[in-house]
Every structure is written in C-alpha cells, then in structure tokens.
C-alpha cells in the first residue's frame, strides 16, 4: 500500500535526501504536504515535481509568492502559512507518515501533533525529544503512533536492537559514534578564531549550517545522547560517545554477553531515511555499497571534553532532568545564530549555554506550556548574555 507523506522541512538537507528516495519509489510513496520556512523558490520546484496536496510556508508574503508561481505553472497544490498550518498538515487525514525534519524548536509543535494523531513519525528533529522527551514519548504511546528514528546514529542503534522490547534487558550500553567534526585535531587555543565557514565544513556529511556548527562544537552529539535516552529508555551512564573519524560505523549496541552489534554504511543520510520510510522492508536508497577493503582503516578515540565543552553541558543537562535540556537547546540555538551572524566567537557558544544553565531555575515540567516557557526564558537569558560579550576581534579594555 502506498504511503502518503507530510514532509516537514522539505527544502533542507534531510528534505532533499527524503525526496530523492521518494522519487526512486513512486509506487511506494506519495507526497501529501511539503513545508518550508522562507525558501519559496525551492519549494515551488519541489511542488511541481511531487504534486503535493498542500504546501506550507512561514509567512503570508512567501505564501502569496509561492501560490502565484504555482498557479502560473498550472499546479493545484493549495498553499497555507504559519505555525497552525504546520500542525494541520501533521495531523491531517491526508497523510499516514510524517517526516519531521524542521531544524530546532520550531519542529516541536507539528511533531507532537503528529504523535497525538497516531501517525507513523520519521523523526529527524531531535529537538522534539530534547525539549519535551517525556511529554513526546507519552503522546506516542498514548495515541498509538509509530516512532522511527532518522538520525543516522539512532537509526543505527534501532537496527542493532532486538525488536522484542522484553529482550532490551540484555543491553549493557549503546555507543553513539561521532566524527569529531572539523576541529577534532585543531589546537584548542585557536578555536576562538574559527569562522562560520570553517565550522560548516564537515569532513564527512553534507548538512545545513546550524547542525554543522553543532557538529563542530559536538553539541549535536550531546543532543543525540539526550535523544537516545528517550528513544531507547536508557540512563546516561549506559550511553557512551565514541569518536570515529571515518563515519562508517554509525553506532553500536553492546550486550551483556559480550556481543557488540554495529551498523555500517557510507555516510549518506539516504540510507537511514530509506530504512525508516520502508521499514520493515528494505529499498534501494541510491547509496553506493560500502567497500571496507578500500577504506582499509577504521579508528576510534575517546571524546575530549575540554575541547568540546558543549558535549559535557548536554550530558549534565540530561542528568539534571526537568527543563534543563529545553534550556540547553534554546540557549544553543541563540548562540549558534549569533556565531553564524559573526556576533560572537565560536568559543562563546559554550560560554553562553553554560551561563544560561548556571542561572536556570530547574523544575519538572507539568506540561508543554512549562517547556515552552523554559525555552523562552533561556532564549532571553542567552540573548542578554551575548549582549555583554565583546564582538569578535574586539577585546575588553583592561
């Protein structure tokens, strides 16, 4: 039976990869809705190729422009805009599968709406779990939704875990791999001077700018540890991070009997996307087969928490519980945006997040409103902290 998809964040890198897989299997997948923030030109091109029922953008001006171009091309795709429109296409009867690929906190509400509508959710938006893990997982369970991880690491863990939850007691730990990003071997003393372009040059993966910076700080790996905790129900002491520069082993599961299962593949997001789209079947993803003889060498090392303080901050937030993870994510989004805008140094990202967490009044969220309130408070605190920092290249007077 053909699956009907709502693709949240279709113009980003995950969206591109998802549509590439969809195009290879038109007999299996059809598109109900595509969404973008402001990249109207790309969204129009996608709509003309995949003919969704609905296209959603962030604002009225972009919506008017997209609708005019679609009508001129003879397209019948309806155009909507705004946060509620994202929620509407996520819970629509017109789709059975929602690919949640909006970057950041903006993806929380539509992802949660999909869970409450009992959809099959392909989760690439890790912030939904980082911000509101218990609330989100309760919604998945209570409404009979199916949650399939798309992040390469969590998809790898999912593939290596037993399907029967009763057998999860045999797991000793899960090991989340990380490339180490572009600054794995760079002298820590020079990190303050790195540029946004340098931070966005990932050695193995093609990603958007925000997640590329998160990879460079290893905040991305910290967020993935938090996500793994909620997805697989393991405490932080049973989740390890391992640097693996080649990005061939995407993660591992270690069992109590000494067995270790790993998922390997070329670093291409179409592999985990295809796995989740077709699960429990397998389909061609357009990815070349892995040639281990050509790679020849796989190496591993422990993470350097002094070099990557954001990783330590994320693990601390997980262990603190409450709204700490939501505050961590919010502060990081503000700090990364400031870095990409060249308003702060690369090293100030961790400084900002640390300062916000130090000033946090932590509490257990009673519901989504508490999470949203903590997110907003952390954004205000991060913005205030950044406002007191010297601009890059400007030092405070002695």
Curated annotation (Swiss-Prot):
* Catalysis performed (reactions): 2-C-methyl-D-erythritol 4-phosphate + NADP(+) = 1-deoxy-D-xylulose 5-phosphate + NADPH + H(+)
Supply the EC number(s): 1.1.1.267
Q: Which domain of life is it from?
A: Bacteria
User: Per UniProt, what is one GO molecular function of this protein?
Assistant: 1-deoxy-D-xylulose-5-phosphate reductoisomerase activity
Name its pathway: Isoprenoid biosynthesis; isopentenyl diphosphate biosynthesis via DXP pathway; isopentenyl diphosphate from 1-deoxy-D-xylulose 5-phosphate: step 1/6
SUPFAM superfamilies linked? 1-deoxy-D-xylulose-5-phosphate reductoisomerase, C-terminal domain, Glyceraldehyde-3-phosphate dehydrogenase-like, C-terminal domain, NAD(P)-binding Rossmann-fold domains
Q: Which Pfam families match?
A: DXP_redisom_C, DXP_reductoisom, DXPR_C
Give me the disulphide-bonded residues: none
For 1-deoxy-D-xylulose 5-phosphate, which residues are the binding ones?
Answer: 126, 152-153, 179, 202, 215, 220-221, 224
> Binding of Mn(2+): at which residues?
151, 153, 224
Q: Where is the signal peptide?
A: none
Keywords of the record? Isoprene biosynthesis, Manganese, Metal-binding, NADP, Oxidoreductase
Question: Do you know which InterPro entries this protein is assigned to?
Answer: DXP_reductoisomerase (IPR003821), DXP_reductoisomerase_C (IPR013644), DXP_reductoisomerase_N (IPR013512), DXPR_C (IPR026877), DXPR_C_sf (IPR036169), NAD(P)-bd_dom_sf (IPR036291)
User: What cofactors does this protein use?
Assistant: Mg(2+); Mn(2+)
Listed GO biological process terms: isopentenyl diphosphate biosynthetic process, methylerythritol 4-phosphate pathway involved in terpenoid biosynthetic process
The residues listed in the UniProt record as binding NADPH, with positions renumbered to this chain, are 11-14, 38-39, 125, 127, 208
Instruction: List the HAMAP family.
Output: DXP_reductoisom
* Family membership noted in the UniProt record: Belongs to the DXR family.
Q: What does this protein do?
A: Catalyzes the NADPH-dependent rearrangement and reduction of 1-deoxy-D-xylulose-5-phosphate (DXP) to 2-C-methyl-D-erythritol 4-phosphate (MEP).
What is the protein's given name?
Answer: 1-deoxy-D-xylulose 5-phosphate reductoisomerase
- Originating gene: dxr
């Amino acid at each position: 039976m053909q699956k009907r998809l709502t693709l949240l964040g279709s113009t980003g890198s995950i969206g591109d990869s998802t549509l590439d897989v969809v195009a290879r299997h038109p007999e299996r997948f059809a598109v109900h809705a595509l969404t973008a923030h402001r990249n109207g030109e790309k969204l129009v091109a996608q709509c003309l190729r995949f003919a969704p029922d609905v296209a959603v953008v962030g604002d009225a001006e972009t919506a008017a422009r997209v609708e005019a171009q679609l009508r001129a091309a003879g397209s019948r795709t309806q155009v909507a805009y705004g946060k509620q429109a994202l929620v509407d296409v996520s819970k629509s009867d017109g789709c059975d599968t929602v690919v949640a690929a909006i970057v950041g906190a903006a993806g929380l509400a539509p992802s949660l709406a999909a869970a409450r509508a009992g959809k099959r959710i392909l989760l690439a938006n890790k912030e939904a779990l980082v911000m509101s893990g218990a609330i989100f997982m309760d919604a998945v369970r209570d409404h009979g939704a199916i949650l399939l991880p798309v992040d390469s690491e969590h998809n790898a863990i999912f593939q290596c875990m037993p399907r029967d939850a009763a057998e999860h007691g045999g797991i000793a730990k899960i090991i989340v791999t990380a490339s180490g990003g572009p600054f794995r071997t760079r002298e820590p003393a020079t990190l303050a001077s790195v540029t946004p372009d340098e931070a966005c040059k990932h050695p193995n993966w093609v990603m958007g700018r925000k997640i590329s910076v998160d990879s460079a700080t290893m905040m991305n790996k910290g967020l993935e540890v938090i996500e793994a905790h909620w997805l697989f129900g393991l405490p932080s002491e049973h989740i390890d991070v391992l640097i693996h520069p080649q990005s061939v082993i995407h993660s591992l599961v270690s069992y109590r009997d000494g067995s270790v299962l790993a998922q390997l593949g070329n670093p291409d997001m179409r592999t985990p996307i295809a796995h989740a789209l077709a699960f429990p079947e397998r389909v061609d993803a357009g990815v070349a087969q892995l040639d281990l003889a050509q790679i020849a060498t796989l190496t591993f090392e422990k993470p350097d928490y002094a070099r990557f303080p954001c990783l330590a901050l994320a693990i601390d937030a997980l262990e603190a519980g409450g709204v700490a993870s939501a505050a961590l994510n919010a502060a990081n989004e503000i700090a990364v945006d400031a870095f990409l805008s060249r308003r702060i140094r690369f090293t100030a990202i961790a400084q900002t997040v640390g300062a916000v967490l130090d000033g946090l009044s932590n509490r257990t969220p009673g519901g989504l409103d508490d999470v949203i309130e903590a997110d907003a408070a952390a954004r205000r605190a991060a913005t205030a902290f950044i406002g007191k920092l010297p601009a890059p290249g400007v030092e405070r007077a002695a």
